[in-house]
From Swiss-Prot:
This is Probable dual-specificity RNA methyltransferase RlmN. [4Fe-4S] cluster binds at residues 144, 148, 151. One of its GO terms (cellular component) is cytoplasm. Residues 130-373 form the Radical SAM core domain. GO terms for biological process: rRNA base methylation; tRNA methylation. The keyword Magnesium does not apply. Keywords: 4Fe-4S, Cytoplasm, Disulfide bond, Iron, Iron-sulfur, Metal-binding, Methyltransferase, rRNA processing, S-adenosyl-L-methionine, Transferase, tRNA processing. It is an enzyme of class 2 (transferase). One of its GO terms (molecular function) is tRNA binding. Pfam families: Radical_SAM. InterPro entries: Aldolase_TIM (IPR013785), Methyltransferase_A (IPR040072), RNA_MTrfase_RlmN (IPR027492), rRNA_lsu_MTrfase_RlmN/Cfr (IPR004383), rSAM (IPR007197). S-adenosyl-L-methionine binds at residues 199-200, 233, 256-258, 335. Binds 1 [4Fe-4S] cluster. The cluster is coordinated with 3 cysteines and an exchangeable S-adenosyl-L-methionine.
Length: 391
């Protein structure tokens, strides 16, 4: 039975318990990761070499090896003095991510990597090869403090923030695998980076934004990825969105909305209790005005919870009230998570939801979900170690 667009009903909300985490904005204090060359701003690299007794220009040489040539073996960095390589590596190239498990799907073109950090914390990233691009979904925190009840990461709670280098190294590790032809499809290089893995990136603002700068800065200062290929996802930290808009980077902003009404979003996305739907959308519009980059609205479709056509219509009205041509909606079929009783919307309901948005003139594309069979899709990253049983 369908509900007319103009007669919304109040459904009971069979929401999951809050789980182990509450809404956490500040990461727990833990020992800092060792300083890595990637943590240094370009202007700091020469002085760091001088501290080691080397010439300042060695900083640029090391940057060329790391970012441009994707070299991680000091023995092959032949433009650095052989007698200095070990000392430089020990001081500036500590191991940050230790791979402990790799799972593949889609004929080997979707790869989920589980890494152990220096303190035992676990994070995951997912590399996805498409015909015209190579995209990696990366983590900005170990765990997440946003406590969204339909997301495996949010239910795990927040362990700690990642450093700039820990974030970037997920990308360089994937780029090395592509460059060395270790992934089906021939040699390649990461072209797109989405901050949609574990964590709320804007809650780890300093490290996440510094990581974006390393990604988009031309080699040898960084990896030289186009800012258009970088997507910063957020549940709606309004002050941080406004701050990011002024960074001069012009990456794509993705707002994880999941409901157009405060009553439901308060439950699905607890940060909404601090910044309401209207405030988040206003900030997203300001981001568009500051950067010229069209904003993506992410909307996980949950059966009988938020997938009603009238909610799509309400969302369309809210977006159009803030102008035309500034936004695109990505409905996402809900991916299953361990212990969750929620499921994805029926295909007919999904089509009706999309049609309601399109009837309001809102560009809408259902997200191509990959990696769900290896718990590598949106909302599924939980960094379960090899020794931990799956639910």
């Amino acid at each position: 039975m369908t509900t007319p667009l103009d007669t919304p009903t109040r459904e009971p909300l069979p929401l999951a318990p809050a789980g182990p985490g509450k809404l956490v904005m500040s990461a727990p204090r833990r020992g800092k990761p060792p300083r890595h060359f990637v943590d240094l701003e370009p202007a700091e690299r020469g002085p760091a070499m001088v501290e080691l007794g080397e010439k300042a220009f060695r900083g640029k040489q090391l940057a060329t090896q790391w970012f441009e040539r994707l070299e991680d073996d000091p023995a092959r960095m032949t433009d650095l003095p052989a007698a200095s390589r070990t000392r430089i590596a020990e001081a500036l190239l500590p191991t940050l991510l230790t791979p402990i498990r790799t799972l593949t799907a889609d004929g080997g073109t979707t790869i989920k990597s589980l890494y152990r950090l220096h303190d035992g914390a676990l994070v995951e990233s997912v590399l996805m090869r498409y015909k015209n691009r190579d995209t990696i979904c990366i983590s900005s925190q170990a765990g997440c403090g946003m406590n969204c009840p339909f997301c495996a990461t949010g239910q795990a709670g927040l362990t700690r923030n990642l450093s700039t280098a820990e974030i970037v190294e997920q990308v360089t590790a994937a780029s090395r695998a592509l460059a060395r032809d270790e992934v089906p499809g021939g040699p390649g290089r990461v072209s797109n980076v989405v901050f949609m893995g574990m964590g709320e990136a804007l809650a780890n603002y300093k490290s996440a934004v510094a990581a974006v700068r390393r990604l988009v800065s031309p080699a040898p200062d960084g990896l030289g990825i186009s800012a258009r290929g970088v997507t910063m996802s957020t549940v709606g930290l309004v002050p941080a969105i406004d701050k990011f808009a002024q960074e001069g980077i012009a990456a794509t902003l993705a707002l994880s909305l999941h409901a157009p009404d405060d009553e439901l979003r308060d439950e699905l996305v607890p940060i909404n209790q601090r910044w309401k739907v209207g405030e988040a959308l206003d900030a997203a519009r300001r981001y568009f005005e500051a950067t010229g980059r069209r904003v993506s609205i992410e909307y996980a479709l949950i059966k009988d919870i938020n997938d009603q056509a009238w909610r799509a219509d309400r969302l369309g009205k809210l977006l159009n009230a803030r102008g035309r041509g500034w936004v695109h909606v990505n409905p996402i079929p809900l991916n299953p998570t361990p212990g969750s009783k929620w499921t994805a919307s029926d295909p007919a309901v999904e089509r009706a939801f999309v049609a309601a948005l399109e009837n309001r003139g809102i560009p809408t594309t259902v997200r191509d979900t990959r990696g769900s069979d290896i718990d590598g899709a949106c909302g599924q990253l939980a960094a379960i170690g090899p020794e931990q049983p799956r639910a």
